[in-house]
Amino acid sequence: MNHNALPTGLALLIICLLALVFSCGCTGTVGETTPADSDGIRTVTDMRGRTVELPPTIERVVILDDGFVEGLLYRFGMQDRIVGLGGAWTKDYTYSFETTDGTTYEYKNGMNPVRYLIPGLTNLPVLVESGTGINYETLASLEPDVVVLREGAWAFSAGSDEKLEKTVATIESLDIPVVILVGPPFQERPTVDRIGEEIRLVGEVFSHGEDADALAVYLDGQIEEIRKRTADVPVDKKPRMMQLGLSPRARQGGGAGMAWGSDTIESYFIEEIANAKNAYEGTGAFVVVSTEQILVLDPDVIVLPTAQGYHPVSELYTAPYYQNLQELSAVKNHRVYALPWTPYNWAKRLEYPIEAMVIAKAAYPDRFADIQVHEWVLDFYRNVYGVDEATAKELRSAQWLDWMVEAGF
């Protein structure tokens, strides 16, 4: 008989206790939720590495961003939990211009897709007006269970780590937990590669982890499909492409438009997703460029982003103030394309693959000949927001993308 052996019952008890200890272990990765304690309190790790305690369910949320998180909550069926917004991005826009022959073109009912999907957002308090800080008195009065703050969004677009820490400390002094997302402008380099991480974190906060993961995989898949189709383009075959902002502010300042340099996410979409060449080799965003500079750049392809207004292709072709750009190669060869209407889109929202697809097909029409973007975008809205075809068409119109139907793009 082995006198050093443990009694069978005691040995089994020790094994069970060890198994329980190891099964309760957890790591502190971003977005991970720890089990609720006896009071139902959960914890998540946000994108700043902060551990945040949350109530078991979230009934009231204030969101300091520009529609990104609101879009996710619509997908989760939790849009009624939103009680306050971070900025005035829920407007219904109109844009018009006059042609050389006196014809007036007018575009109506342009809006953020989430504004269309959740019209009640227009009735909610806005905590950050243009040129002001957060209204903490209003925030406290809303009694939210959590504040979700997205760095890089217009609602929180400028400032240092010190400003962020002060903002978070002030909110937390009101006994309100804060979860921080880090959007592309505040990352080490501006890419969309961590948007999936943002989506998954929001999913954990609102207990919709599986659905959030499915969406992140879908969005990543759209970008990877573009990259796969253009990956083998030789350097000498890449078209020179320019995002040209037809901004009225640029014209008022003596320029002809705006450009985005190599250090911007706009350039990233051209060079690292579509695998084309940014014709503007400078740096900086919203850089005012003159008529002479644009003519010297002479890009092969031009895409027209939101720039203090919506800018259709016909504006560049027919507006009197752009007649001195008619000798551009892109204009003469009819290789000018309008991007979707995306006001307050500094940090990119869930629709970012639409921009990427328009840019990619504009650069390489032959490589995307099998994709009719005006149909593809309907599938996109259905997959992202779970809407029917009629609503998807309304969203396409809200982003002023019906030109794609008319052009067969």
Description of each model-found segment:
Residues 26-409:
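N-terminal ligand-binding lobe of clamshell/alpha-beta domains
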Residues 1-36:
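Secretory targeting signatures
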